[in-house]
Regions:
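Short, small-residue-rich loop/turn micro-motifs
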Residues: 12, 103-109, 252, 258-263
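Midchain, well-structured core segments that form catalytic/ion-binding scaffolds
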Residues: 13-178
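Flexible, glycine/charged-enriched surface loops at secondary-structure junctions
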Residues: 2-5, 60-64, 114, 136-149, ...
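Short amphipathic alpha-helices in soluble, non-transmembrane regions
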Residues: 183-192
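Zn-dependent metallopeptidase/amidohydrolase metal-coordination segment
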Residues: 164, 234-284, 289-292
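Short beta-alpha connecting loops at secondary-structure transitions
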Residues: 36, 173-177, 207-209, 264-277
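A short beta-alpha structural unit
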Residues: 148-157, 169-176, 201-220, 246
Length: 302
């Protein structure tokens, strides 16, 4: 029995793949988004998150948000560093910032045969140039920057029609908010120039942003001591992915524990961890939670 109560949280829609943006549930809990905003997020078919929660019986009636003494989140690294260095545990000190964009280019649909190259307003050509631009933005700010075009919809998507409309997404990440802002500027300037050169109409919207998140020093130290108690090899690491902990950090002391994953692969069917890594992560999580629970009780009694 712990000195302070311990609860397990399972957050809805952490990835944001169907209902963008990511981490909506923890964001609502932390007050970053209001409840109506979260429930109104719609997928590509127009179904809202609220409707789907009702359909599967997951719509709750409890008030949103409550006091939390501390929050710890265990996760696979989703990258290769821990495995490459032979470390059992990643002591996560920070999470890098993110910006998500949705971009739509509108050109003119036309026949692929009779339409001369010089007169085309090819929306897909514009998107292709932006993909190259996004890659360059990331490479120019390496090794810490990440820049990805991960989703694309082409209309009319016919082999003999010049695409008249293309929708696609951009994902920027960096641990320095100033660099992230510079990446944002480079994207906006580049997109406008590409659209102008080809004669396209442009819609660009940033749909998701959070600044780099430093985790609570006392919670990070609890993770570090947990690794030492278990005799596990460990190193400090910055999270390259977004996690619910990033929003919980706005309302309570927070830290994360990483374990390795095979070949650093994640978001793939072959994602895998070894049992001894999971065991190590579980033991460190237990040590950190118990230590912080005792600390919280002692602080309340002072």
């Amino acid at each position: 029995e712990t000195e302070a109560p311990v609860e397990v949280a399972v957050w809805t829609n952490e990835e944001g793949s169907r209902f963008a943006p990511a981490m909506v549930a923890s964001g609502v809990f932390a007050g970053v988004f209001d409840l109506d905003y979260g429930l109104s997020r719609a997928d590509q078919d127009g179904l809202t998150m609220g409707q789907e929660l009702d359909r599967i019986g997951y719509a709750g009636d409890q008030p949103v948000g409550k006091p939390v003494g501390a929050y710890f989140e265990a996760h696979i690294e989703q990258g290769p560093i821990l495995e490459d260095e032979g470390k059992d545990i990643g002591i996560v000190t920070d999470a890098q910032g993110q910006r998500w964009y949705e971009i739509k280019f509108t050109g003119v649909e036309a026949h692929a045969g009779p339409t001369p190259m010089k007169t085309r307003k090819d929306a897909l050509l514009g998107a292709a140039r932006v993909i190259d631009l996004v890659n360059k933005i990331g490479l120019d700010r390496s090794p810490l920057a990440c820049a990805t075009v991960g989703m694309m919809q082409i209309h009319p998507n016919s082999r003999n029609v010049i695409p008249g409309e293309v929708f696609f997404t951009v994902d920027f990440r960096h641990p320095d908010d100033a660099v992230l802002a510079d990446m944002d500027k480079a994207l906006r300037v580049g997109v406008e120039k590409i659209a102008s050169d080809i004669g396209l109409k442009t819609e660009l919207e940033q749909i998701f942003y959070y600044a780099p998140v430093p985790f609570d020093e006392s919670c990070v130290d609890a993770v570090r001591k947990g690794a030492e108690l278990g005799g596990f090899s460990a190193r400090e690491i910055v999270s390259g992915a977004g996690h619910d902990a990033c929003y919980l950090a706005q309302v309570c002391p927070t830290a994360m524990i990483f374990i390795p994953c095979v070949d650093g692969i994640s978001h793939n069917e072959i994602e895998e961890v070894h049992k001894h890594w999971s065991d190590a992560g579980g033991q460190v999580l237990l040590h950190a939670v118990l230590a912080k629970a005792d600390e919280i009780v002692m602080q309340k009694s002072d």
